[in-house]
Amino acid sequence: MQYHEQFDVIVVGGGHAGTEAATAAARMGLNTLLLTHNIDTLGHMSCNPAIGGIGKGHLVKEVDALGGIMARAIDLGGIQFRTLNSSKGPAVRATRAQADRLLYKAVVRQMLENYPNLKIFQQACDDLIMDGDRVAGVVTQSGIRISGKTVVLTVGTFLNGLIHIGMENYKGGRAGDPPSIALAQRLRELPLRIDRLKTGTPPRIDARSVDLSVMQAQYGDDPRPVFSFIGDASQHPRQVPCYVTHTNERTHEVIRNNLDRSPMYAGVIEGIGPRYCPSIEDKITRFADKTAHQIFVEPEGLTTHELYPNGISTSLPFDVQVQIVRSVRGFENAHITRPGYAIEYDFFDPRDLKANMESKCIPNLFFAGQINGTTGYEEAAAQGLLAGLNAGLRAQEKDAWHPRRDQAYIGVMMDDLSTLGTREPYRMFTSRAEYRLLLREDNADLRLTGIGRELGLVDDERWGKFNAKMEQVEQERQRMRSTWIHPQHPSLEAVNALVNTPLTREQSLEELLRRPEVTYDALMAIEGVGPALPDTAAADQVEIQIKYAGYIERQHDEVEKQLRNENTLLPLDMNYRDVNGLSNEVIAKLNDAKPQTIGQASRISGITPAAISILLVHLKKHGLLRKTA
């Protein structure tokens, strides 16, 4: 049966990658279809009810700067907001929000249902329509054939998903949802490298059976940070605290005594789990000297009693889970509402992708999210937006776009994945970026909103607010440069009280603000110096740009040097055995990874500077020197 309409972009999957992919393509004015096995689970948080964190918050801000929906959704569905690393430099400060799981999902669904150019259809995808070697649409579980110029796969953990609780296991995409078996089998027939990964989740607990009074309360920040550049704290719903408790020796003893019943330690689970979100079994084994591990007790929402005990993800049998939970202070009488579990699933080697998320061997097919070996809502959302954008560009026969490593954490992530691949679930950290000072949360809009506007991702409302902010920043920076404080200034005494070294000569406000002990707010509070900008985001931008100007300029110089050969293209069909002077090891690694540029090749483990020089000579000799735009 043929569907009655053809689409520019078909997105398979309605999780965090799928919703961003579909809305990105739709914002570009393209006829877009979001195919989901269940409309009621659009934007569902399968694991912890939170958005953001170190590195992750940066990704959310970048998605927002490009017009994405995640930041706006969490502003409307977040029940606790905090800035992490607030005492550290601006490069590593990160926003995190606790979410009301149901409210967040409802907000996402409402956004999608009202999105122009976007249609939603509830059907599982079982097959791809091929036109020669390229994708031309999908086939649903009921045999409906839907034609599309491009297809984006954002299927999460559903491909051959296998859920484990103790020695028992059953097929599932996540708890309560069926797996995608037919599509997984179809994809295994294609020339793609495939492997297995695993992730897990803790048991959920009824708050009415818990004694929160013996735990440490953890409140949000005041004033509250806002995720979206066009958001406002007044949009936030009622705020609630989280709580902190700990495992203890009794907990650890229960786990050690039952490791033989763990599917991970019994060899039943083959997939590798996330390094930075290990199960409680892993923690006890890998950190045997630790007598306690933190558990963050997170409310699931404002209208439910369920709690999420972040830190005790487990796949041990249910009876052991009960013992583990009840050994913890405050949980002695806890009632588990849902058992914890581990899930194994198929993923595809992201080295088979171009940096724009398109398959190297199957034109018009794009991958985003956990199918690429990543973990986390934020990583999925960022990939989804990039895949949806490039699927839209491909549908219009326009050039692809992806950010460089110095432009965005999205660029860092996709370069890591497409160049190096991953053997374990990939998670974003600020430490993965070599140009952290350029890739701050606060300047994500400065870096990306202009580009997003050119690509058709940024609407008039966002563009107007962005330009108004930029005008404020530029005018204030000009005022700071041209306003001088001299030794006879009437407010000299107040200025000297602010600085470590009293003024002996005339200094501009900009020079004063460069001093480490001076803040913008304190300087503006001095009579005759202000007023401060009413927009705190613009004021923060002024302060950061002035205080860190030297460091920022130095990083820009480093980027300029690095870019000289970074964008030199390498032909995808190049046989490195034809390049004289390369070692067999280098040839094997280059033929395996098939890097798109000299920059990507240089970041492959074992590729030496000498090998890069040989490649450049070969390209020049054969007239192959080309650079990306």
From Swiss-Prot:
One of its GO terms (biological process) is tRNA wobble uridine modification. NAD(+) binds at residues 273-287. One of its GO terms (molecular function) is flavin adenine dinucleotide binding. The keyword S-adenosyl-L-methionine does not apply. FAD binds at residues 13-18. Keywords: Cytoplasm, FAD, Flavoprotein, NAD, tRNA processing. PROSITE patterns: GIDA_1, GIDA_2. One of its GO terms (cellular component) is cytosol. Its main location: cytoplasm. It is found in: Cytoplasm. Belongs to the MnmG family. Homodimer. Heterotetramer of two MnmE and two MnmG subunits. This is tRNA uridine 5-carboxymethylaminomethyl modification enzyme MnmG. It comes from Aeromonas hydrophila subsp. hydrophila (strain ATCC 7966 / DSM 30187 / BCRC 13018 / CCUG 14551 / JCM 1027 / KCTC 2358 / NCIMB 9240 / NCTC 8049). The gene is mnmG.
